[in-house]
Every structure is written in C-alpha cells, then in structure tokens.
C-alpha cells in the first residue's frame, strides 16, 4: 500500500484529502507563532499554560493574548458542529466543503491584517483550526487530528507496539499512517516558518491554496461516484 493510495468511501476520510489539510494545519501553527506574536493557533494546551502563567503573575494584558485564541478555538468547534447539523443532508456540496470554504475566506482575510491586529489574526486562525479539526477526524478509517500531534503520536506508538506483538500488517499500516500524519504536520510547519521570512503576513495564503486543493479533490470524487452509478 502506498501513502496516498486510492481511497474507497468518503473522500473526506482519504489520505489524499488529508494530505493538504494536514500541511495546512502545520503551516497555520507556524504562521501564528513566527509571524503573529508567538501564539499557537492549534496547540491550545500551550496557550492555556501561558495564559495561566501570566494570570498568576498578574500580567493581565499578556494573559488576554492567550485567552482570545482559546475562546476562538472553542467557538470554532461549536460553529463547525452547527454547520454539520444544519447542512449534513446537502447533496450538491458536502457540508465539510462548506467548512473548508469558510476557512479559505477567513484565512485570506487574515493575510491583510497588520501586526497591530495580531490578537485578531490569532483569534481568526484559532477559530479556523477548530473548524478544521472538528469535521476532519478520520483518515483511512482511523481517528486522528489534523491540527495537532500528541494524539497522533500516542495512537501511532500504540499501534506500533501492537504490531510488534501481533505482526499484523494492517496494524503496522495504521501506525505508519499516524506517523505519516505527524511528519506531514511537521513539514507544513517547516514550510510556514521559512515562508514567513519571505512573505510575512501573506504566508497564510499558502494555507488557502492547500485547502483549495482539498476542496476540489472532494468534488472530483463526487464526479467519479456519479460516473460509476
């Protein structure tokens, strides 16, 4: 089996769709950290630690910087779930595509925000990350996260341990899928960190491009299904 093998079933769960979504997730995190005041868009654990640290130091201004993305992340999950509940029966466009489209529009706007609005930019990116992680939770039938690594690392290592005890090739394939997701996220973060040196705030538009590819891939799969019917 190849890493980007042909997928049967929902294209939103395919590795091909996830490939670009995961790269985008890594890029977004590097973007807010490198270009928007060292705030994490995805890793809310880090933001909560820093929020708590500044609160106990009595530094309310710095605490607010980390509170805003945390609240935006929660709101993003809520909105994504509302979209799912209201549009899950749509036929022409999949509800997950609506999420991606909203992400593209919001991230495109972030690229125009000046440094003086970094708090706003970070809030929007965190909101987008939450919208992304909520609907895209499976790849090749396995639960995963496209915007953070700790769960994928745990699942991959657990599967690898199971493989060494059972020698089940399917379990090995599962482990490699998880570690592949982590590597893709790291690649996206690396691309984002380098790109910010050259393009600054506009780097986030690369993420828009990656998400656009995923958006179109889901259309292509729908057309293939219609031709096969």
Regions flagged by a language model, labelled:
Residues 78-91, 196:
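Helix-to-loop junctions at the C-terminal end of transmembrane segments
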Residues 104-118:
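C-terminal ends and interior cores of transmembrane alpha-helices
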Residues 1-12:
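Short, Lys/Arg-rich, polar N-terminal cytosolic tail immediately upstream
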Residues 91-97, 190-209:
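A membrane-interface helix-boundary motif in multi-pass transporters
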Residues 98-105, 202-218:
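Symmetry-related core transmembrane helices of the 12-TM Major Facilitator Superfamily/SLC fold
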Residues 92-101, 122-124, 145-149:
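Cytoplasmic-side transmembrane-helix entry/capping segments in multi-pass membrane proteins
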Residues 12-61, 136-173:
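Small-residue-rich hydrophobic segments that form or flank transmembrane alpha-helices
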Residues 70, 74-78, 182-190:
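Hydrophobic/small/kink-forming positions within alpha-helical transmembrane segments
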């Amino acid at each position: 089996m190849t890493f980007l093998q042909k997928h049967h079933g929902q294209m939103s769960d395919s590795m091909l769709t996830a490939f670009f979504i995961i790269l985008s997730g890594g890029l977004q995190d590097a973007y807010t950290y490198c270009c928007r005041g060292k705030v994490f868009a995805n890793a809310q654990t880090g933001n909560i630690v820093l929020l708590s640290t500044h609160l106990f130091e009595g530094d309310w201004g710095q605490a607010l910087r980390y509170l805003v993305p945390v609240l935006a992340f929660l709101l993003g999950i809520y909105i994504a779930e509302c979209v799912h509940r209201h549009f899950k029966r749509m036929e022409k466009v999949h509800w997950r595509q609506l999420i991606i489209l909203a992400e593209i529009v919001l991230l495109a706007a972030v690229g125009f925000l000046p440094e003086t609005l970094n708090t706003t930019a970070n809030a929007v990116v965190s909101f987008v990350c939450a919208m992304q992680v909520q609907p895209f939770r499976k790849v090749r039938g396995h639960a995963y996260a496209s915007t953070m690594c700790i769960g994928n690392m745990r699942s991959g290592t657990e599967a690898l341990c199971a493989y060494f005890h059972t020698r089940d090739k399917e379990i090995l394939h599962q482990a490699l899928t998880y570690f592949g997701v982590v590597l893709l996220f790291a690649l996206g973060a690396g691309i984002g960190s380098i790109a910010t040196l050259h393009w600054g705030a506009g780097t986030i538009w690369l993420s828009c491009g990656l998400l656009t590819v995923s958006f179109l891939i889901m259309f292509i799969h729908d057309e293939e299904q219609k031709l096969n019917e």
